[in-house]
Amino acid sequence: FASSDLVPDNYKAQLKTLPAGADENTIAAIKAENTAIKTKAIANCMIAVEVASRIGASPLMVMQNMAVIYGRPSWSSKFLIATVNSCGRFEPLQFRFTDKGALGMVDYTDYTYNPQTRRKEAITKQFDGKKIHDIECVAFTTKRGSDGVLESSPVSVRLAVQEGWYTKNGSKWQTMTKQMLMYRAASMWTNAYAPELSMGMRTVEEQQDIYTDYE
């Protein structure tokens, strides 16, 4: 895997070439660096193979859908949904949307830099959502051979604003609202009913939403 062009860079041993006319010290330094690069790539591949064996997936698929966000391994939301749908224990995940009307004014917590303390501090702000609809999403499905419906906790635009996800710089909640609702609802569903499939790891979107300087 570490020598393949099909795997992401985290799993690939991208070795440095020796420059022409390099002295012994330079050659020794580059060889040592290449050894470290190769060791790290192989170690990452071994972790991916171990994760793949635990969730019954292809190692290549795991490598292509597991990313490191802020130093923590995270799943692609699409891959997590596909894993639930293909595990054989559940019917495919479905999503129910409910429009709860205008969002209105919503209090939320933001973090601003305080030059006196040299750190970010939590402050309460108010979001004007009078022109935005509060949409709620629930992920649900049933176990194979059972009629009992398994539902996630509801995720809504109001929740996204209150938690600060909607207002973060670069947030996709404002441009891909329904998609983000689906991704977060699917993650909540998996954590509740099949945590072994995610192995306790958050999704890429979750990590990007909840990361603050306090973590």
List each model region and its residues:
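Polyanion-binding surfaces on beta-sheet-dominated domains and ring/shell assemblies
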Residues: 1-215
